[in-house]
């Protein structure tokens, strides 16, 4: 195990050297499928974490296909927190690329850009969830205990209802990486828009919300949510509130703050908290 780990770390160092990339392209093309299998299926968690960093370096040079990137992003739902944390930086890169594509050629305000960032995150999580559902179905229909889905590092077993939900796992893993996840107010602002109005009106080409003939505000397609995306953002919102309160409560216990007046409320921006909470 130790020898394999050292070999992976040496490979990681090689990909960090810009001068080596051109000479490594042939190796990458030949072995990247095997490297991805190691990231998703290896029995040694330390090896998996290191391989994920290798793949992150490979991806920075544009050497991974979209389906390969998507397969790696499923690890944000892995049952092992070390894997989820290890892949968080990779997921952030995929999200940033998606946001850039979504905003390309559009002149948007800062608020609109923030809404588009949330839309991008929701869209990715929905797509990854669907991919994981398909993987689970294949696993359930297979009698081969060594099928790839059974060996995918515990990702499939996250479906166990006794364990945390997928979105809760993603919130924990991406909390420090993707800004919208820790910004519950931003999530709430987008949820409060009437996304159903767009289905009843012709799509507006202008990159902003506009009023329809019926008087309802039509949400621009750049940040318009499907029902599945709304459900995901609601889960993100709930998870964000819980984590923010949990962290603040833990900090309060450490600091032994007095339980008096408004200072006793551990929640950030307590005065602006939604009334439903």
Model-based region annotation:
Residues 1-277:
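Extended alpha-solenoid helical-repeat scaffolds
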